[in-house]
From Swiss-Prot:
Subunit relationships: Homotetramer, a dimer of dimers. One homotetramer interacts with 1 SecA dimer.
Family that this chain belongs to: Belongs to the SecB family.
Listed HAMAP family: SecB
Protein name according to UniProt: Protein-export protein SecB
CC per GO annotation: cytoplasm
Pfam families in alphabetical order: SecB
Chief place where the protein resides: cytoplasm
Keywords carried by this UniProt record: Chaperone, Cytoplasm, Protein transport, Translocation, Transport
Gene3D superfamilies reported in the protein's UniProt record: SecB-like
Species annotation: Beijerinckia indica subsp. indica (strain ATCC 9039 / DSM 1715 / NCIMB 8712)
Any one GO MF annotation of this record: unfolded protein binding
Compartment(s) of residence: Cytoplasm
Amino acid sequence: MADGNGTQETQDQAPAINAMVQYTKDFSFENPNAPRSLGPQEKAPNIAIQVHVNAQQLAESDFEVNIVLEGSAGEGANTLFKFELDYAGMFRLLNISPNDMHPVVMIECPRLLFPFARQIIADAVRSGGFPPLYIDPIDFAALYRKRLDEVAASAPQLKS
């Protein structure tokens, strides 16, 4: 029941991001040079990581959001390990304006998924015989802005 100043109504209309379910869609870990690669290394390996965010609308307020993390340690014939993780969640977004919907889906939802994806990779790398790889936090807002800039740059330009 609402009190006299409308507090309950305000709470009912507050924006909300509900994580309905989270899941691994696809995962692979390769240790192509084991057991040779498991010994002491002369220097720290080169680690490369790529991040992709994808989303699709499932219903009016429901979205599936995926983080795809691909990475490797070492180079060429000296590859220590490779991984690819497609980690997803289904989110229900409530009371979010249409103008804010896309940024929320592409920034806030991946931000909620990331710690779980990071732990899956750390555990797999450790299980592969290496020290765990803890991926640095990702600035999904910067990633989103970069993607918008890339789309704008690739759009055909109208000539006047």
